[in-house]
């Protein structure tokens, strides 16, 4: 277990608090997150062919992902309200898996990182794909939501060992 004196969120009595970021310097920050929505054969085909009753699945999911990133501090306890300067959400059809790969890129100039915003964008976009396709099948799996890379801040740049793409290249 971590030494309680080194943790940033517990208060002296062991309760929780939001970390004070007021002494940190503004810096450029980016984050890339990814995930996958396994749809199965019919739903995958119908999304590709724009044949879902609710409408354009990927455009709706893209908007939802961007909206999710902007609401992260309202959804995640103790998450700072980051100044988001840009959010991109995009999709790739994964034929082998009959899945849609979801990627989000977030950008900010501020005192806190935007990793949680990128992860939230992927999660909300994925949930939206589920919602729009559930009339075709309920056997939809959302998975592998993870941070691929981040830049900036006190901890510097980081890239997942399982990824070969940096935020600038994503």
Swiss-Prot record:
Record keywords: Lyase, Molybdenum cofactor biosynthesis
GO annotation (BP), single: Mo-molybdopterin cofactor biosynthetic process
Any matching Pfam family: MoaC
Keyword Lyase set for record: yes
Active-site annotation: 131
Catalysed reactions, as listed in the record: (8S)-3',8-cyclo-7,8-dihydroguanosine 5'-triphosphate = cyclic pyranopterin phosphate + diphosphate
Gene3D superfamilies registered for this protein in UniProt: Molybdopterin cofactor biosynthesis C (MoaC) domain
Domain of life: Bacteria
Pathway this chain belongs to: Cofactor biosynthesis; molybdopterin biosynthesis
Region of interest (Disordered), ranges: 1-25
Residues bound to substrate: 78-80, 116-117
GO molecular function: cyclic pyranopterin monophosphate synthase activity
EC id: 4.6.1.17
Reported function: Catalyzes the conversion of (8S)-3',8-cyclo-7,8-dihydroguanosine 5'-triphosphate to cyclic pyranopterin monophosphate (cPMP).
Record text on subunit structure and interactions: Homohexamer; trimer of dimers.
Family: Belongs to the MoaC family.
Protein name as annotated: Cyclic pyranopterin monophosphate synthase
Organism per entry: Salinibacter ruber (strain DSM 13855 / M31)
